[in-house]
Amino acid sequence: MTKVLVIDDEAPIRLLCRVNLEAEQMMVVEAPDGPSGLEKARIETPDVILLDVMMPGLDGWRVAEQLLEDERTRSIPIVFLTARAEFRDRAKGLNLGGIDYVTKPFNPLELAPLVRKLLERIERGERDDLRAEKIDELRSLMESE
C-alpha cells in the first residue's frame, strides 16, 4: 500500500488529501507543521511527501532542505503544495529535490492519480526525467511570457 505523508498547516487541506487518497487505497500520515513532518518522515518512511510551502515557523522550503540533508529521507519524492505559482518558486522547489508541484487551490481528485503516476515513473528509474520535464516546462512558460 502506498504511504503518503501530508505536511500542511491547514487542517482542511490535510483532510481533503486524506479523504481522497484513502479512497484510492493509499495510507495517509498527517503532520500539521514542519518539525512534526520531519519527524514523521524519518519514522514512517513514506513513499511520497505532499509538502505545503507556506507554513508558519519551519516553512516547506526549509523542511525540504532538511529532508535532503538527512540520508534517511533524501530519496523520498516531494510534491510541493503551494499557492505560490511564480516561476522562481517552482524552480526553487525543483532545486530542493521536488519532483512536482500542485498549485492551490487544486482538484483533490487529481492527487491519487498524480501520486501513482509519479511513483510508477520513479520505480522505472525516471526520477531525473520527471525533474527535467518540469524544468523544461518552466523554461517554456518563461519564454512565452
Residue ranges and their predicted role:
Residues 44-50:
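Active-site beta3 strand of CheY-like receiver
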Residues 55:
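Receiver (REC) domain active-site loop signature in two-component systems and cognate sites
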Residues 106-115:
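C-terminal output helix
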Residues 122-145:
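CheY-like receiver
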Residues 15-23:
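Charged docking surfaces used in two-component/phosphorelay signaling
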Residues 99:
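Short, glycine/charged-rich "phosphate-handling" switch motifs in NTP-dependent
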Residues 25-32, 40:
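Short hydrophobic/Thr-rich beta-strand motif most characteristic of the beta2 strand and flanking loop
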